């Protein structure tokens, strides 16, 4: 494989088709973050790249894949043939919907499904914790002390805001279209928990269809290493400039 298009601070970008670049890397990874074309339009960039599931399966046994239910159903055979087994999925709730069909409910979500190969015990699956748990305690009324007047004892009410809880399967992450460099760019707020689930601290991630390389930005934020592959040289250049700007705080969710 040729030298990386970009390399710096635990991140590499390779220019090319992932089906050709992946076998040439000669490396394995803790997990993959994949955002393939959904095939929902007739646009050239939205065509499903046949064979990518097998190519990814040769370098990792754990994968998060974004998509729509229609996409997963239409290409189910490719996942099966590559010996990927479905673990579970999460729903990414978006602030802006897609689709303009007047006879269908406006879709404001996408799916991210987790797939694995081999033994479940051999892949990382550490459920992230969020600090937004809420505990409410309300003491019951005491027994009526005066049936005529209906007098009751005092009550107390307490609530604790914040605290740890396991991440739930619906994740809200807003898109900032004004700052995005790619039309299907994923927010860091959806990528970060997926990475924390499937990749141990200091571990490695492969993104075979990287686009804006948001996976690489999220990897830096969480202390992981990332290799990104992108077929569009113009997008590689934009992503490289973005990575050269350094890690932005999580408030920048795009």
Give the positions of each predicted feature.
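Conserved SAM/SAH-binding loop
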Residues: 16-20
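Active-site beta-alpha loop architecture of Rossmann-like, nucleotide-cofactor-dependent enzymes
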Residues: 39
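Beta-strand-turn-beta hairpins that frame and shape the catalytic cleft
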Residues: 4-13
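Conserved Class I SAM-dependent methyltransferase catalytic core
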Residues: 46-98, 115
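Arg/Lys-rich, low-complexity, intrinsically disordered N-terminal tails that contact nucleic acids
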Residues: 1-5, 252
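Phosphate- and divalent-cation-binding pockets in alpha/beta enzyme and binding domains
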Residues: 21, 67, 71-75, 218, ...
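Active-site beta-strand/loop signature of hydrolases that rely on acidic residues for catalysis
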Residues: 34-35, 65
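Class I S-adenosyl-L-methionine
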Residues: 25-34, 43, 82-254
């Amino acid at each position: 494989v040729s030298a990386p298009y970009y390399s710096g601070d635990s991140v590499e970008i390779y220019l090319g088709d992932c089906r050709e670049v992946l076998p040439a890397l000669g490396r394995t990874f803790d997990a993959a973050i994949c955002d393939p074309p959904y095939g929902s339009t007739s646009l050239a960039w939205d065509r499903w790249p046949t064979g990518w599931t097998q190519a990814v399966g040769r370098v990792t046994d754990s994968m998060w894949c974004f998509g729509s239910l229609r996409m997963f159903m239409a290409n189910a055979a490719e996942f099966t043939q590559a010996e990927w087994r479905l673990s579970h999925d999460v729903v990414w709730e978006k602030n802006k919907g897609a689709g303009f069909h007047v006879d269908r409910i406006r879709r404001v979500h996408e799916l991210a499904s987790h797939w694995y190969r081999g033994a479940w015990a051999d892949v990382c699956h550490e459920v992230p914790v969020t600090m937004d748990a809420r505990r409410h305690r309300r003491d019951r009324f005491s027994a009526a002390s005066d049936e005529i007047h209906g007098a009751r004892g005092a009550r107390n009410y307490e609530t604790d805001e914040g605290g740890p809880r396991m991440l739930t399967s619906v994740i809200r992450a807003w898109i900032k279209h004004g700052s995005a460099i790619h039309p299907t760019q994923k927010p860091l707020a959806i990528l970060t928990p997926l990475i924390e689930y499937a990749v141990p601290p200091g571990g490695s991630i492969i993104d075979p269809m990287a686009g804006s390389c948001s996976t690489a930005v999220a990897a830096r934020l969480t202390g992981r290493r990332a290799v990104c592959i992108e077929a569009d040289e113009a997008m590689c250049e934009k992503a490289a400039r973005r990575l050269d700007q350094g890690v932005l705080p999580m408030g920048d969710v795009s």
